Structure formats: structure tokens, C-alpha cells
């Protein structure tokens, strides 16, 4: 007997239809951005004021939200959620592969010094970088799940409120949803990881979540004309017309 929690055939068909419709590079770039931001998050940026905690992951974190905004604009909120959670599953698979690789015996090429000797401390540090910590993986996964749902919902609500279809509206819905969702993402991670494991205060968590979200939002602002242009190309080429007719326009 099928469990009540199992996806219905219609939901599975919806997921399959969108993944068939979605340009392959969108999902590939989304997955790549998740992998890259998690690896780069291991490098904290120095020379910053005490109220700003930022890691190198911000160079890629905006990409995922920009792709969701583009997808929601063209294919709808449900499609944005499917894109996000599919990418999250692939990311977890890659995290597992990285963890397995860290357990393999051997030395990283970067652990060798000028004399050709492998330095155990550096080799162990590289293994740990790719292996990650269970609480960091858990926290980042919960954070991106929550912030993705939040981003896509806010994006749609802002679009309904503005009622127009131009770059100004696209930028507004993207900037508002991304700014708030990045804050939610950062704060969720801080509540799960930074406060209990690194001893942050709640004030530190909120302040750094807000300032970090601003830095990440600025990256999307810079590239928003490009993402808007891509959406317009999709519309001109009627990309996903059959999907829209079946799942969006029919509602």
C-alpha cells in the first residue's frame, strides 16, 4: 500500500515535465553554485569590521537566487521550488562523494612543500575541507530549503502587487525576494550552526545575517540585466510553452 507521504503520480509528472522543460544549463549552474558556495564558505574574509562576517561563498550564493527568480518569472513558483529542491538533492550527493574522497588514503598535491615532502597537517586540513562537518551540512541544507521556498513565495507576491511586466518590476521582485531570502538563509544557518557550535550571540547572528545578505544582494543587482535578458529570450522563443499551458495557464 502506498504511503500517504509518497508523491502522487501527478506530482511526479509535474516534476518530470519541468525538468524536461527547464534548460539544462540552469539546473547545472544551480547545482554548481551550491557546491561552490559551500566549498568557498570555508574561507572567511579578513580585514572586515567586527559586525560583518562574510566568507568567500557570497561570490556564488547569489547565483542560486538569481536562477530561482528567473525560473519563477518564466515558469511559476512551483517550478522554482522544483528547481531548488532538485539541485539540493544533487548537492547532497556531491557532498557524499566529497566525504568518501576525504576518507581515501593518499596525499593532496597542495600538501607537498618545496622539498617534495607531504605535510600531514595540510593534508588533513584539505581532507576536512572536503569532508565537511555534519552540522554544517545539515544547517546549510535546512537554510537553503527554507530560503528557497521563502524566496519564490515572496517573488510571486511582489509580482502580484506590482501588476506590470518590465525590467523595473522584474528587478523589484528579484531584489526584494532575494534580499529577504538571503537574510532568512543566513539567519537560519546561524541559528542552527553559528550560535550553538561557534558561540555566536543572537545579536551577532542577526547583524551578520543582514550585512551578509546585503553583500550577496549586491552581486545579483550587478547581474540583473543579464538575467532579465535571458528571461525575455525564453519568452520570445516560447521556452516551456507546453509546460505553462499544462501547469500554469490551466489554473
Model feature map: region roles:
Residues 91-115, 144, 148-152:
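Transmembrane alpha-helix/helix-exit interface in multi-pass inner-membrane proteins
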Residues 11, 167-172, 183-190, 202-251:
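Alpha-helical transmembrane segments and their cytosolic interface
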Residues 41, 45, 94-98, 151-155, ...:
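Alpha-helical transmembrane segments and their lipid-water interface positions
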Residues 87, 123-144, 173-177:
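Alpha-helical membrane-spanning segments of integral membrane proteins, especially the hydrophobic core
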Amino acid at each position: 500500500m502506498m504511503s500517504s507521504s509518497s508523491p502522487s503520480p501527478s506530482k511526479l509528472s509535474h516534476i518530470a515535465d519541468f525538468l524536461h522543460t527547464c534548460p539544462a544549463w540552469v539546473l547545472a549552474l544551480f547545482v554548481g553554485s551550491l557546491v561552490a558556495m559551500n566549498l568557498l564558505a570555508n574561507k572567511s574574509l579578513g580585514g572586515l569590521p567586527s559586525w560583518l562576517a562574510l566568507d568567500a561563498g557570497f561570490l556564488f550564493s547569489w547565483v542560486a537566487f538569481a536562477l530561482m527568480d528567473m525560473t519563477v518569472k518564466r515558469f511559476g513558483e512551483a517550478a522554482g521550488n522544483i528547481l531548488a529542491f532538485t539541485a539540493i538533492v544533487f548537492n547532497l550527493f556531491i557532498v557524499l562523494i566529497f566525504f568518501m574522497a576525504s576518507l581515501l588514503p593518499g596525499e593532496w598535491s597542495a600538501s607537498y612543500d618545496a622539498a617534495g615532502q607531504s605535510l600531514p597537517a595540510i593534508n588533513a586540513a584539505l581532507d576536512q575541507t572536503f569532508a565537511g562537518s555534519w552540522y554544517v551540512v545539515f544547517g546549510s541544507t535546512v537554510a537553503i530549503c527554507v530560503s528557497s521556498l521563502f524566496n519564490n513565495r515572496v517573488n510571486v507576491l511582489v509580482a502580484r502587487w506590482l501588476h506590470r511586466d518590465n525590467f523595473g518590476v522584474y528587478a523589484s521582485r528579484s531584489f526584494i525576494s532575494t534580499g529577504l531570502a538571503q537574510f532568512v538563509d543566513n539567519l537560519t544557518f546561524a541559528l542552527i550552526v553559528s550560535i550553538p557550535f561557534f558561540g555566536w550571540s543572537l545579536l551577532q547572528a542577526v547583524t551578520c545575517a543582514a550585512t551578509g545578505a546585503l553583500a550577496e544582494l549586491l552581486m545579483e543587482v550587478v547581474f540583473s540585466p543579464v538575467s532579465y535578458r535571458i528571461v525575455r529570450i525564453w519568452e520570445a522563443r516560447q521556452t516551456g510553452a507546453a509546460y505553462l499551458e499544462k501547469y500554469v495557464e490551466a489554473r
